[in-house]
Regions:
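Catalytic core and acceptor-binding pocket of nucleotide-sugar-dependent glycosyltransferases
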Residues: 126-233
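Active-site regions of enzymes building and remodeling cell-envelope glycoconjugates
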Residues: 21-36, 46, 79-87, 107-109, ...
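A conserved donor-nucleotide-binding helix/loop in the catalytic core
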Residues: 33-63, 72-73, 150, 184-196
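N-terminal anchoring/stem segment of glycosyltransferases
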Residues: 1-44, 51-58, 230, 249-257
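Short, polar loop motifs at secondary-structure junctions
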Residues: 11-18, 71-73, 207-209
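C-terminal helix/juxtamembrane-tail motif
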Residues: 218-257
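GT-A fold catalytic core of metal-dependent nucleotide-sugar glycosyltransferases
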Residues: 47-106, 110
Length: 257
């Protein structure tokens, strides 16, 4: 977003960024939070962000990114829609090389800022594993509504709409906890439930939330080898493989290091 005025809100159990985080001249608003064992930090992410609600309301757009992502491509105004912005989960994607190779990028059926933009492919095994199936959970999605699946790592949109979404998801998560329920994929399950009822105006394709592996620059999704980034497109944001950066315990440890 090189043509936009951007401020960063960082939530961390470390007291400040001094000495270890390069801020690259951005305006930074730092909030120290308490360490919690996994999955509570991700489950409560919206509650955490809402600690800064009044300040966030001063901005036209709010976007949330996981801490373990790396921006590797230019992201521009295509993410700035008139409502919520959601990102296609790589496992719900379809992009066979035979479809894309040899085509002019402008002819690829993946226009920006259209709720129909990505090609979706949710196989039944993955659907049965990913969507919340507990009917008592506020994140439950019945089988007939399991048409799309969005990543939790990159989400946002117009400030008032996204704040309302965070408030409702936080309420639903607390309601679930009151019944001793944690959704299958934590806050991501609640995000997908919310988007069924409140469809996003802007859907970004899976290369805005691409899984890292040794050969990620090939554009092929490691665990879904038939899927690749179309010719003429580039990976925009890399979701880091925790095993390649110290291991899951360094991110999800139950004890403060």
């Amino acid at each position: 977003l090189s043509n936009e005025e951007v401020s960063l809100f960082i939530f961390c159990d470390y007291p400040s960024s001094r000495g270890w985080l390069e801020t690259h001249g951005y305006e930074i608003f730092w909030t120290q939070i308490s360490h919690q064992p996994f999955p509570l930090p991700t489950l409560f992410r919206h509650r955490t962000l809402l600690q800064r609600e009044q300040h966030l309301r001063e901005f036209e757009y709010i976007f949330h990114f996981d801490a373990d992502v790396l921006f590797v491509g230019d992201i521009g105004s295509e993410i700035l829609g008139e409502g919520l912005t959601a990102t296609q989960h790589p496992s719900a994607s379809y992009g066979n090389k035979d479809i894309y190779l040899g085509k002019d990028p402008k002819d690829i059926p993946l226009p920006v800022n259209s709720v129909d933009e990505p090609i979706w492919n949710l196989n039944q095994e993955w659907v049965s594993h990913s969507f919340e199936k507990n009917k008592k959970s506020k994140a439950f999605i019945p089988s007939e509504e399991r048409k799309k699946y969005f990543a939790g790592a990159f989400q946002g949109g117009k400030s008032d709409l996204y704040i309302h979404a965070m408030q409702e998801m936080s309420y639903n998560i607390d309601t679930d906890l009151g019944q001793n329920i944690i959704a299958r994929y934590h806050d991501e399950s609640h995000w997908n439930r919310y988007l069924v009822d409140n469809p996003p105006k802007t859907i970004l394709p899976f290369w805005y939330c691409f899984p890292e592996w040794e050969d990620w620059q090939s554009g092929v999704v490691a665990w879904k080898r038939e899927v690749c980034v179309p010719e003429g497109k580039q990976v925009k944001m890399l979701c880091l493989d925790k095993d390649m950066h110290g291991g899951y315990e360094s991110y999800r440890g139950n004890a403060k290091k």
